[in-house]
């Protein structure tokens, strides 16, 4: 496939090489003599496909090496000179500049300002004996006031402290200066007395420093930071060793205990919050006045409005506003009076309109009057019988309204909520009693009802006692 075929496929018009309209294109001499540029990085056949179109990117052939840096400035000289790393060591390094400008004398290192050391106290043998004897005298006066056992242990400690010589203490302080209180290095390099432990070295160093500063200035604030106890340090290391030598099961058990403790803390906080809310609700309004002002209806209304308007207490405001009990009682009294007045009016109207009643209404009224008279007659008859005679005759007066039809007495037992009902049934099983009596007579049902009420009361009391004991254990 040639380039002309590809141009035809792509619908590109190729310039005709034959003359058109009698015009002949005469190539110039410069164009003819111009050499064609050699294309690199592209195949010749692919480049021929471009035809007379210019390529989108100028392709230039050139080397990929960096050009030589051309600089007219003279290079600055560098000198290999000496410098003092410290007072005993002299090293050499390269410095920009000639030797004439720098000089022959070695200069200090610019990093010497960062080479800081701790200020360890130094003293002579006379000074050491002076402040140590002074401190031991004050310590003996304090120890005389303590018990015999404490004195015995302190004497042992003093003997161990007095076994240190001045030369050994001086050797210890020199090591502390040399290694800047890096105690593991000090303990590793310590060769004066191999029986000393790391805690002994620390304790003796801080004990001597505390006596030194105390003799010069008793009110020095550094004295409180120089207290070191070797026994506590040993206990701390033992505890850390036990902590790091735990097994995976022990770690999991401790994590479970931590989770349980957090649960107990949350429950304790919740219980305290509930107790605070209850105490806040039971808290009466603070007033210097007597209670007699709240005995009237006007005083009760004022108290009710004051409690509603009290927004300073941190309590949850319910959307349902509580009813005023005094107003509710007044409404009940008013309704009762209205009903009485209506009944009186109805009786008067009935008496006046009695001839206008229908036959059915008259019969219903007669049956009602008959029942009323029968119940009154029955009560009058039962007045002459005592409780034993009533029980023998089986006569019972029902105060509540009985449901029509036949029913079982066991179905009239009072029921409770499911959770409370399960607790009551569990207690009845512990007492070896059935949930329903086998012989549900009237007396048995009464006793069963009383038993259920007492069990309910005991469960409620146990709940309050457990809550109170939990609160007491939390407050302790």
Curated annotation (Swiss-Prot):
InterPro entries found in the cross-reference section: DAMP1_SANT-like, Homeodomain-like_sf, SANT/Myb, Swc4/Dmap1
Region labeled Disordered — which residues? 1-40, 136-157
Tell me which positions the record assigns to the signal sequence.
none
**GO terms of molecular function:** transcription corepressor activity
Annotated Gene Ontology cellular component terms: chromatin; NuA4 histone acetyltransferase complex; nucleus; Swr1 complex
Tell me where in this chain the PTM N-acetylserine is found: 2
Q: Which residues form the SANT domain?
A: 156-209
| Comp. bias (Polar residues) | 17-32
Instruction: Give the protein's function.
Output: Component of the SWR1 complex which mediates the ATP-dependent exchange of histone H2A for the H2A variant HZT1 leading to transcriptional regulation of selected genes by chromatin remodeling. Component of the NuA4 histone acetyltransferase complex which is involved in transcriptional activation of selected genes principally by acetylation of nucleosomal histone H4 and H2A. The NuA4 complex is also involved in DNA repair.
- Please report which protein family the annotation says this sequence is part of: Belongs to the SWC4 family.
Protein name as catalogued: SWR1-complex protein 4
């Amino acid at each position: 496939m040639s380039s002309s075929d590809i141009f035809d496929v792509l619908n590109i018009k190729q310039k005709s090489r034959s003359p058109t309209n009698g015009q002949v294109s005469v190539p110039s001499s410069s164009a003819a003599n111009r050499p064609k540029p050699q294309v690199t990085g592209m195949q010749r056949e692919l480049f021929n496909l471009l035809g007379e179109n210019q390529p989108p990117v100028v392709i230039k052939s050139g080397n990929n090496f960096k050009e030589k840096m051309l600089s007219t400035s003279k290079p600055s000289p560098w000198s290999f000179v000496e410098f003092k790393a410290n007072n005993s060591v002299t090293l050499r390094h390269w410095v920009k500049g000639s030797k004439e400008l720098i000089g022959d004398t070695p200069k200090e290192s610019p990093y010497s300002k960062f080479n800081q050391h701790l200020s360890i106290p130094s003293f002579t043998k006379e000074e050491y004996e002076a402040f140590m004897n002074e401190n031991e005298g004050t310590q003996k006066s304090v120890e005389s006031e303590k018990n015999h056992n404490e004195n015995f242990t302190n004497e042992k400690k003093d003997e161990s402290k007095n076994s240190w010589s001045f030369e050994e203490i001086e050797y210890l302080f020199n090591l502390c200066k040399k290694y800047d209180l890096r105690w593991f290095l000090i303990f590793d390099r310590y060769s004066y007395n191999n029986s000393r432990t790391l805690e002994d070295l620390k304790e003796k160093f801080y004990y001597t420093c505390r006596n030194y500063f105390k003799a010069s200035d008793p009110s020095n604030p550094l004295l409180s930071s120089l207290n070191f106890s070797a026994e506590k340090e040993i206990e701390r290391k033992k505890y850390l060793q036990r902590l790091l030598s735990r097994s995976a099961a022990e770690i999991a058990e401790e994590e479970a205990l931590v989770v349980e403790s957090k649960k107990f803390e949350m429950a304790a906080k919740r219980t305290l919050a509930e107790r605070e809310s209850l105490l806040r609700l039971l808290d009466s309004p603070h007033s210097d006045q007597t209670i007699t002002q709240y005995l009237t209806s006007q005083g009760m209304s004022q108290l009710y409005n004051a409690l509603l308007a009290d927004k300073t207490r941190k309590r949850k405001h319910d959307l349902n506003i509580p009813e005023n009990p005094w107003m509710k009682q007044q409404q009940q009294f008013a309704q009762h009076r209205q009903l009485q007045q209506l009944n009186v009016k109805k009786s008067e109207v009935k008496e006046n309109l009695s001839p206008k009643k229908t036959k059915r209404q008259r019969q219903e009224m007669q049956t009602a009057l008959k029942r009323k008279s029968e119940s009154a007659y029955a009560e009058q008859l039962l007045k002459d019988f005592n409780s034993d005679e009533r029980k023998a005759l089986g006569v019972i007066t029902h105060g509540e309204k009985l449901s029509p039809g036949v029913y079982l007495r066991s179905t009239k037992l009072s029921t409770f909520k499911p959770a409370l009902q399960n607790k009551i049934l569990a207690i009845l099983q512990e007492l070896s009693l059935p949930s329903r009596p086998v012989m549900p007579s009237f007396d048995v049902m009464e006793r069963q009802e009383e038993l259920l009420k007492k069990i309910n009361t005991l469960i409620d009391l146990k709940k309050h006692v457990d809550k109170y004991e939990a609160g007491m254990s939390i407050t302790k």
